[in-house]
């Protein structure tokens, strides 16, 4: 129902304060025309009376003005003229004109009739002499003729009922009696309200108070009214309420438009609305765009998160933040929100992410760019050593597996040679003259690390050496001889290349070389 969250402000019906209200005279019986000799009671209303207070009455006739002081707030009168009353400290009331007539037929009407009231007109004959029929005219036109009721009732009176009224009475012997003319003017219950705003050109993010002001007449100051508020003729800002004020806690540029309010009686028979009021919400352009990082200073750690923070010093409304890298045309990210700052997270930063970054902010006046911030990426301590250690370990394990496979192969061949002695083709060739009768399989295998660089650069190698020695029958018994002293030594080199952190493929290459 509401475009944004609105709060109703509690306030009395707009108008004058109670101290400035005029007193109001009420008449009993409630007419303004009487026959001579009749008595009428006037009451001065509109303020609180105390026993010791008195009321001043003013009576103006053709001979002048007469003052009467009464101990209470009532006065009994029998003379024609204008009557006013005044209490201590109050202004004079509006005048009430009374007419005491000597005619045989009078038209009686109430002192005041307001729009929405029922207008009652009474055709009255002196001394209660009977009438057989009554005719009412309005501006010379016959309004009604009745032989049952001498009163005329006009419900829901309005200004359309203003005019000159008269009644004509008919007696038993076809006598005709004509009353005085009575001009009736229906009074306005309240004027069209006026919508007021604390600021018709507010800045975005501020509040605006709206008030729907109208004024009830003193005679009807106790009439309850309901109020509501609209925008652009359709958007309802509030339901009907007895409070004539509305607070808009926060306004934005889209809240600009034509505002108006309505006031009506509780019964809803009188409804009026105010002229429109244009409200233009002002937007402050963004300025002071700044790009920062978390961690601060543009110092990022490889593998960890980097947060790019884009902020503005000023600017209201929806702001679109966009992050960019100098060597890229496309935006890294974009966010639109009502705030002075926004964040973009880069989950795992890498060396390739180093470079110049900047951001822009735009709240419909065009993008404003920040200064370029240089982001550097440093390696995580221990990251390179870990890669080297892993590469070296992998190389050694590969060499060890190769040695085990070679021993197993020789064992299988030796076992096969025993079981097939009759097969000449499967026996090894006989040794030549002067040659020792050696086994073709090594008797001992030694794995030795030749070189490990704990701080390799890109392309560094890790070498491992596998030495195999073939022993004769005599030499097998002599275990004190070193492997490197044997002339028949087989050396296997294993080359392990380690990966530099920039190698995104994450591969470690290796190459075996036998000599």
Curated annotation (Swiss-Prot):
Signal peptide positions (record): 1-19
Keyword tags: Adaptive immunity, Cell membrane, Chromosomal rearrangement, Disulfide bond, Glycoprotein, Immunity, Immunoglobulin domain, Membrane, Phosphoprotein, Receptor, Repeat, Signal, Transmembrane, Transmembrane helix
Annotated effect of mutating residue 493 to F: Loss of interaction with PTPN6 and PTPN11 and partial loss of function and phosphorylation
Motif ITIM motif 2, chain ranges: 461-466
Primary localization: membrane
Compartments reported by the entry: Cell membrane
Residues in Ig-like C2-type domain copies: 23-97, 102-183, 193-271, 275-374
Region: Disordered, residue numbers: 494-515
Keyword Amino-acid biosynthesis listed: no
PTM entry text: Phosphorylated on cytoplasmic tyrosines upon activation.
Consequence of changing residue 451 to F: No effect on function, phosphorylation and interaction with PTPN6 and PTPN11
Associated disorder: A chromosomal aberration involving FCRL4 is found in non-Hodgkin lymphoma (NHG). Translocation t(1;1)(p36.3; q21.1-2).
Protein name from the UniProt record: Fc receptor-like protein 4
Species assigned in the record: Homo sapiens
Recorded name of the encoding gene: FCRL4
């Amino acid at each position: 129902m509401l475009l944004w969250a609105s709060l109703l402000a509690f306030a009395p019906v707009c108008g004058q304060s109670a101290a400035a209200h005029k007193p109001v005279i009420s008449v009993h019986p409630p007419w303004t025309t009487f026959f001579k000799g009749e008595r009428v009671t006037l009451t001065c209303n509109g303020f609180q009376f105390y026993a010791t207070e008195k009321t001043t009455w003013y009576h103006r006739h053709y001979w002048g003005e007469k003052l009467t002081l009464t101990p209470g707030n009532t006065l009994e009168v029998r003379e024609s003229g204008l009557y006013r009353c005044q209490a201590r400290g109050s202004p004079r009331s509006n005048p009430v004109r009374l007419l005491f007539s000597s005619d045989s037929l009078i038209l009686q009407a109430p002192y005041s009739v307001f729009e929405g009231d029922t207008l009652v007109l009474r055709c009255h004959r002196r001394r209660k002499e009977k009438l057989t029929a009554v005719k009412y005219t309005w501006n010379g036109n016959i309004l009604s003729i009745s032989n049952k009721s001498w009163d005329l009732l006009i419900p829901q009176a309005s200004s359309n009922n203003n005019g000159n009224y008269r009644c004509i009475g008919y007696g038993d012997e076809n006598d005709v009696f004509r009353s005085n003319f009575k001009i009736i003017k229906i009074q306005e219950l309240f004027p069209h309200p006026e919508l007021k705003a604390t600021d018709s050109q507010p800045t975005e993010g501020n509040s605006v108070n709206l008030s729907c002001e109208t004024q009830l007449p003193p005679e009807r100051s106790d009439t309850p009214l309901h109020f509501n508020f609209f925008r652009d003729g359709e958007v309802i800002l509030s339901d009907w309420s007895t409070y004539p004020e509305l607070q808009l806690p926060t306004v934005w540029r889209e809240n600009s438009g034509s505002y108006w309010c309505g006031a009506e009686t509780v019964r809803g028979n009188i409804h009026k609305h105010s002229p429109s009021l244009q409200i233009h919400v002002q937007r402050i352009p963004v300025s002071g765009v700044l790009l920062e990082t978390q961690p601060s200073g543009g110092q990022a750690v490889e593998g960890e998160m980097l947060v790019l923070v884009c902020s503005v010093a000023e600017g209201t409304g929806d702001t679109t933040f966009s992050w960019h890298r100098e060597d890229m045309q496309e935006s890294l990210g974009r966010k639109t929100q009502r705030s002075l700052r926004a964040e973009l997270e880069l989950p795992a930063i890498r060396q390739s992410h180093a470079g110049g970054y900047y951001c822009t902010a735009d709240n419909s006046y065009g993008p404003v760019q920040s200064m370029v911030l240089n982001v550097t990426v440093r390696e995580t301590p221990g990251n390179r050593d870990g890669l080297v250690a892993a590469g070296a370990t992998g190389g050694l394990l590969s060499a060890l597996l190769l040695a085990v496979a070679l021993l197993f192969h020789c064992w299988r061949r030796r076992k096969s040679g025993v079981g097939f002695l009759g097969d000449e083709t499967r026996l090894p060739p006989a040794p030549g003259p002067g040659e020792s009768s050696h086994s073709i399989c090594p008797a001992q295998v030694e794995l030795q690390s030749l070189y490990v660089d704990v701080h390799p650069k890109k392309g560094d190698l890790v070498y491992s050496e596998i030495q195999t020695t073939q022993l004769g029958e005599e030499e097998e018994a002599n275990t004190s001889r070193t492997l490197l002293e044997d002339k028949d030594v087989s050396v296997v080199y294993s080359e392990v290349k380690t990966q530099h952190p920039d190698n995104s493929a994450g591969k470690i290459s290796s190459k075996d070389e036998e000599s």
